[in-house]
């Protein structure tokens, strides 16, 4: 049985979050946590928080199973675009430039490895 966690309205552009999501897609949870902890990207902090939440959701959904991080893997990670806040920045000659402050929604799905020794 799989479990998922969704982090909504993260104040990071979706393009930057997709770079981090690609690092952990398909990896074991313990490897994914190590990658996110050692990543220098600012978005990796939010991704780590969501990954921990997905693991906790798996434990909540399956109370009779005792699984460790090495028995779970990241089944899917996807990033959707959230709301865009539009702001104005003063520009030369009385004009204004539009600044788009983008946000995203991060979804992480974890599942149990079928054969732990082969994955």
From Swiss-Prot:
Question: What is an example of a GO molecular function annotated in this UniProt entry?
Answer: rRNA binding
InterPro entries, alphabetized: Ribosomal_uL22, Ribosomal_uL22_bac/chlpt-type, Ribosomal_uL22_bac/org-type, Ribosomal_uL22_sf
Question: SUPFAM superfamilies, from UniProt?
Answer: Ribosomal protein L22
Q: Keywords assigned by UniProt?
A: Ribonucleoprotein, Ribosomal protein, RNA-binding, rRNA-binding
Query: Which GO cellular component terms are attached?
Result: cytosolic large ribosomal subunit
Q: Which domain of life is it from?
A: Bacteria
State whether keyword rRNA-binding applies: yes
> PANTHER family, alphabetically?
CHLOROPLAST 50S RIBOSOMAL PROTEIN L22-RELATED, LARGE RIBOSOMAL SUBUNIT PROTEIN UL22M
Q: NCBIfam families under this entry?
A: rplV_bact
Q: What does this protein do?
A: This protein binds specifically to 23S rRNA; its binding is stimulated by other ribosomal proteins, e.g. L4, L17, and L20. It is important during the early stages of 50S assembly. It makes multiple contacts with different domains of the 23S rRNA in the assembled 50S subunit and ribosome. The globular domain of the protein is located near the polypeptide exit tunnel on the outside of the subunit, while an extended beta-hairpin is found that lines the wall of the exit tunnel in the center of the 70S ribosome.
Quaternary structure and partners: Part of the 50S ribosomal subunit.
Could you say which protein family the record assigns here? Belongs to the universal ribosomal protein uL22 family.
Q: What is this protein called?
A: Large ribosomal subunit protein uL22
Organism this protein belongs to:
Chlorobium phaeovibrioides (strain DSM 265 / 1930) (Prosthecochloris vibrioformis (strain DSM 265))
Q: Give the gene name.
A: rplV
């Amino acid at each position: 049985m799989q479990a998922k966690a969704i982090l909504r309205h993260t104040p990071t552009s979706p393009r930057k979050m997709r770079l981090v999501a690609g690092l952990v897609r398909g990896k074991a949870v313990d490897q994914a946590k190590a990658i996110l902890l050692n990543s220098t990207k600012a978005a990796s902090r939010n991704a780590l928080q969501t990954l921990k939440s997905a693991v906790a959701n798996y434990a909540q959904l399956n109370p009779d199973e005792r699984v460790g991080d090495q028995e779970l893997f990241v089944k899917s990670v996807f990033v959707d675009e959230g709301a865009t806040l539009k702001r104005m920045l003063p520009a030369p000659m009385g004009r204004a430039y539009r600044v788009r402050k983008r946000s995203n929604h991060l979804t992480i799905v974890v599942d149990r490895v079928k054969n732990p020794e082969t994955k």
